[in-house]
Amino acid sequence: MNRPSRHLVDPQLLSLLDRFPALVLSMDNLPAVREGARQPAPIYAGAEAAAEVVERRIAGPPGAPDVLISLCRPLVTPGPWPCILHMHGGGYVMGAPSADAPQHRVLAAALDCCIVSVDYRLAPETPFPGGIEDCYAALTWIAAQAEALNIDAARLGVMGESAGGGLAAALALLARDRGGPRLAFQHLIYPMIDDRTCVTSAPHPFAGEFLWTPHNNRFGWSALLGETLGGPQVSPYAAAARARDLSGLPPAFISTGALDLFLDEDLDYALRLTRAGVPVELHVYPGGFHAFDFVPEAAVAEQARRDSRDALARALRPPPFCP
């Protein structure tokens, strides 16, 4: 059972809680919430960087519609660029690449990389496996078109926040198991990877009071999985924490807040990856709730953004030359 945790929140993060009302997702308010989730976060509004964003439609999974992707590329450097395949957050039920475009311009220019965002289909209209298959279609398209896109396929990785982090983790599993493109890294920011949280298991008592609550978590997972939620047949490509074998996966960066609903599942996944021989960089931020890193003025949020950017810079570097 959750206990009040406001006294544990970093004081510089309280402004976000005071500015935004508590979100209680339902089928009635989902259309309005989705519209808001398509807008860029205020922290990146008006950001300018030497990068361009172009949209393209690519072939979707067999029998499915085409997939809309956004490509963000530096304007100054000629490439070939390393590439990040990014999946947006939103509990599997909301979100869009448009919300991340300003942030991606900044990152693409700063890291000298190409960022491809996937407008994957959302639940409940498209339950599992529609969304992850859209992302896999984008991954295989990037690998196949790497030369034409001026991308260095040897430096291709996946990234996402929340549900996007869950998709990134699942995509790493799917690419391994299908013999798909080899990934250089998986960059998981407070990833949503275990449907059993708040269903058959409970997080620590101070987790999940703010922003992404147990109610919203159940809403998102139910939309994606329907009646299979919490059951033994849930696929690891829907909930990466369900995977029994984590060997052979790319190096992982995992970050989360100490008050995030996903803390326990993320810590457990990091430990299991480590035990499977996968290099893991793990960060837990005291006083941080879900999506705390969007607070521009908070030192702990600045640190989280810096750690994420620095880890990406390391992951995107060319491999050392060996004569």
Question: Language model features by range: what are they?
Answer:
Residues L173-P232:
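Hydrolase active-site cap/lid region
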Residues P80-G89:
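Short beta-strand element of the alpha/beta-hydrolase
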Residues A143-V158, R178:
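Gly/Ser-rich "nucleophile elbow"/oxyanion-hole loop immediately N-terminal to the catalytic nucleophile
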Residues S98-S117:
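Short amphipathic alpha-helix adjacent to the substrate-entry channel of hydrolases
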